[in-house]
Swiss-Prot record:
The keyword Lipid metabolism does not apply. This is Probable GTP-binding protein EngB. HAMAP family: GTPase_EngB. Residues 22-194 form the EngB-type G domain. GTP binds at residues 30-37, 57-61, 75-78, 142-145, 174-176. InterPro entries: G_ENGB_dom, GTP-bd, GTP-bd_ribosome_bio_YsxC, P-loop_NTPase. Keywords: Cell cycle, Cell division, GTP-binding, Magnesium, Metal-binding, Nucleotide-binding, Septation. Belongs to the TRAFAC class TrmE-Era-EngA-EngB-Septin-like GTPase superfamily. EngB GTPase family. It comes from Listeria welshimeri serovar 6b (strain ATCC 35897 / DSM 20650 / CCUG 15529 / CIP 8149 / NCTC 11857 / SLCC 5334 / V8). CDD domains: YihA_EngB. GO terms for cellular component: cytosol.
Amino acid sequence: MDVNNVELIISAVRPEQYPETDLPEYALAGRSNVGKSSFINTMIRRKSMARISQKPGKTQTLNFYKIEEALFFVDVPGYGFAKVSKTEREKWGVMIETYITSREQLRGVIQIVDLRHKPTEDDRMMYEFLKYYEIPVIVVATKADKIPRSKWQKNAKIVRETLDFDPDDKFVLFSSETKMGKDEAWQFIKEGME
């Protein structure tokens, strides 16, 4: 998709704050500091629309980005960040679960994992949660450029096995540096919009 117009519409914490719209929405879920902001910026060809932080746990709201008057990317808080209080983590969990299970406009979730590392228990639980609720999901393994190409398949296999990955789902190796995987991710989005 050729993206020229992107706007952060609202940062929401409750359903009554979600934008009133019929446009399809795609949620971006992943651990803190896994590369969600870089993924968004690569997909929409912007350097800093989604703020990239060195500090994990920066996104604390559901951020609704309207793209080309055609769809929304919804950046959800990163899960599994240890330095946030248990109460805060539970609040985020409820916020994310409420959005994913009740939002009619949600067409799919882009679950982002780091190709360099074995997925965590939180990653596994998120994937299981999406499968349980029959939410279409694509797993995007970011930071492929950070490891030698010779390790891509081995690491991808570890990610798939750890998540108990459903072969019917889409799995994409992604790099915000080289833009690898960008077209495949857009393809998943376009298919869900048809």
